[in-house]
A protein has these predicted regions:
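Cleavable N-terminal signal peptides of Sec/SRP-targeted secreted and luminal proteins
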Residues: 1-16
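Extended terminal accessory/targeting regions
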Residues: 15-192
Length: 192
């Protein structure tokens, strides 16, 4: 588990984020020009923020609409399904949001925050599918992933200002997660 924490903590270092567009792509992919069509803006918003995650997954599997960019490197450098928690679908929607907002000229600090917040919502939704005893650990890790993408996400082509408050929040969420994990392991050991 310390490997996971180290992996999340070492995603990327940073300096000031521009309010203008940023080139945010899963590693090794090329921006899909057709995603920039203004008619696709409401469809993008719907898929990122309004449909259930399961609907997004079904649309992604069909590449519907084909003009949007559904490429993803899953959870980038963090584990995709840590401890068996099904985080990949949420990470895929997060990548979809970053790259299509970027292609549409709407990837701003504010929209990055909304997309990052939606990731936390999606990951916590996925946590409802895991064993009830593991749920607090899953939710705690979802919060760590959320703060990690707020702090480090979208940095392949941009630099983000170091934020002491965000660093403190990240450390707090990490400590909470570690405590939840320790409690889960203690309960698991007691129950045999």
């Amino acid at each position: 588990m310390n490997f996971l924490i180290l992996l999340l903590a070492t995603l990327v270092a940073a300096t000031p984020i521009p309010r203008e567009l940023a080139q945010v792509r899963p590693r090794g992919t090329v921006l899909k020009a057709s995603a920039a069509d203004p008619k696709l803006i409401p469809v993008t918003d719907e898929l990122v923020f309004n449909v259930p995650l399961e609907t997004f997954v079904a649309r992604r599997n069909k590449q519907d609409p084909a003009a949007l960019d559904f490429a993803s490197d899953n959870c980038t450098t963090a584990p995709d399904n840590p401890l068996g928690f099904p985080f990949t679908p949420g990470c895929n929607r997060h990548d979809f949001g970053y790259q299509n907002f970027q292609a549409q000229g709407r990837f701003t600090v504010e929209n990055k925050q909304k997309i990052d917040d939606n990731l936390e919502k999606d990951l916590k939704h996925q946590c409802t599918t895991v064993n009830i005893l593991k749920r607090p650990v899953c939710n705690g890790l979802a919060e760590v992933y959320h703060v990690a993408v707020r702090k480090f996400g979208g940095l392949d082509d941009i630099q983000v200002k170091r934020d002491d408050a965000l660093e403190a929040e990240y450390q707090e969420k990490l400590a909470t997660y570690k405590a939840l994990e320790a409690e889960y392991l203690r309960l698991k050991a007691r129950s045999g």
